[in-house]
Amino acid sequence: MCTAATYKTKDFYFGRTLDYEFSYGDQITITPRNYPFSFRHAGTKQTHYAIIGMAHVAGDYPLYYDAINEKGVGMAGLNFVGNAAYANVKPDVTNVAQFEFIPWILSQCASVTEVRELLAHMNLTNTPFSEQFPLAQLHWIISDETASITVESTADGLHIYDNPVGVLTNNPPFPQQMFQLNNYMHLSPKQPVNTFADDLTLTAYSRGMGALGLPGDLSSASRFARVAFTKMNSISGDSEAESISQFFHILGSVDQQRGCCEVTEGKYEITLYTSCCNATKGIYYYTTYENHQISAVDMHRENLDGTTLICYPVIQGEQVHFQN
């Protein structure tokens, strides 16, 4: 289970939590402009936009979980188990394997408008990366500073939805996630007034009662509602420090703690990492379950005209700042 969100102050921010019971050994990975992308069915791109994100690198290929490109477009894949379905290769369209969807989009799109144009002629195929890495059942959020969309490939085809909240979790399908927000239309950051009955004297006895009824469990539908409410009522200053701090607080509203979500006997899902990308400046910030200090990699401090992947290991272990 995972949660992705967008946030806009002076700059545009994009990020996600990755919630799972173990890590594949992920790295912050920069794909420079001249790294050759050899797509399974869509030819080779010798030059393209530079990309930075979290990936598992297998056979010198970046299997991105979430990433941004140098033009400010962000994209993340989130679990969509039981609903995701991919097609066989088809004629007269661009066939893109599921595992290469993120680099295929981010390598060539400078806006969500351009993404939509590509998706109109694309078929997402069931081609696996390898026998060791079978197909992942995912759906995706793709965003720039002006728009967000959700892309879902199901048994009845490829669907592209406007995403007005700039949030995505997992199941159910996105239209149902949006519809369930109707259940929470009464929520407010303001203190409630008595509309229960004119004949009763009812008063708010605690701060925060305007959000009474906001779900607090770890299910994907509840996380969608909670992070949407938090994000859409969120206020911060425009500085970089204020913006990234607020973004981590937004996604912190759906953090998963070890012991609260048992997936098999003795195995627990946790928030392995939380990312916050300044998509305007090309900076990838992150924290991990074991390290709450914010770490960062700036793509523009690297040679973006190179031909080989640039990888940074995830920093683990709490970084405690003693004051005495």
Stretches with model-predicted labels:
Residues G15, A76-G77, V151-E152, Y161, ...:
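Beta-strand residues in well-ordered beta-sheet regions across diverse protein folds
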Residues K8-D11, N69-K71, S143-A147, E152-G157, ...:
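Short acidic-glycine loop/turn motifs at beta-strand connectors
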Residues M1-Y13, L118, T127-S130, L135-A136, ...:
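C-terminus-biased signal that marks the final domain/tail of proteins
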Residues Y20-F22, V81-N83, D156-H159, G166, ...:
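Short, surface-exposed beta-strand-loop junctions and turns on beta-sheet-rich folds
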Residues H121-H159:
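Catalytic cofactor-binding cores of redox enzymes
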Residues M1-V93, H121, N126, C311-I315, ...:
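A contiguous strand-loop segment
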